[in-house]
Amino acid sequence: MERAIFAGGCFWCMVQPFEEQAGILSVRSGYTGGHLPNPSYEQVCAKTTGHTEAVEIIFDPKQIAYKDLVELYWTQTDPTDAFGQFEDRGDNYRPVIYYTTERQKEIAEQSKANLQASGRFDQPIVTTIEPAEPFYLAEDYHQGFYKKNPKRYAQSSAIRHQFLEENWS
């Protein structure tokens, strides 16, 4: 099994697209990239810990390749917005691909270069590619949020879905 970590704005919106793929064993919401061990949601939202909201994906590389996860990641984000994603603003919502191996880094960098060269976006691709740091699980009420709170999830992801429809369909 392998591990992938992606930050793409609110972690609530990043779970379902990955969870629906064959070969995915788990998708968990959490925090990474900061300087405070085991931060709380409130601390991360206060923008004082340096963490981003992210998802940790455990996957079977025999069933789904890391490259495919990176390609799916792009289609869930606005890779031209370094200061958050959609209605969620700030460093804790910035788009990041965290790599856990040098091979993941190479795949992510090549994929980013391909996306930039594709001309899909007029603006530069600003999603960063960074080494994975400790991943801290978010509180239980954040796990599987889209299943537990479908109406609130739909409301919180409306702007994201409009952008994805307009730019990735």
From Swiss-Prot:
Provide the species name: Streptococcus pyogenes serotype M1
GO biological process terms, alphabetically, are: protein modification process
**In its UniProt entry, what is this protein called?**
Peptide methionine sulfoxide reductase MsrA
Supply the gene name: msrA
SUPFAM superfamilies this protein is in?
A: Peptide methionine sulfoxide reductase
Q: Which PANTHER family match?
A: PEPTIDE METHIONINE SULFOXIDE REDUCTASE, PEPTIDE METHIONINE SULFOXIDE REDUCTASE MSRA 2
Q: Which HAMAP family match?
A: MsrA
Q: Where is the signal peptide?
A: none
Q: What does this protein do?
A: Has an important function as a repair enzyme for proteins that have been inactivated by oxidation. Catalyzes the reversible oxidation-reduction of methionine sulfoxide in proteins to methionine.
Query: Where's the active site on this chain?
Result: C10
Q: What is its EC number?
A: 1.8.4.11
Protein family membership: Belongs to the MsrA Met sulfoxide reductase family.
Give the superkingdom in one word.
Bacteria
Which keywords, in A-to-Z order, does the entry hold? Answer: Oxidoreductase
Q: Which reaction does it catalyse?
A: L-methionyl-[protein] + [thioredoxin]-disulfide + H2O = L-methionyl-(S)-S-oxide-[protein] + [thioredoxin]-dithiol; [thioredoxin]-disulfide + L-methionine + H2O = L-methionine (S)-S-oxide + [thioredoxin]-dithiol
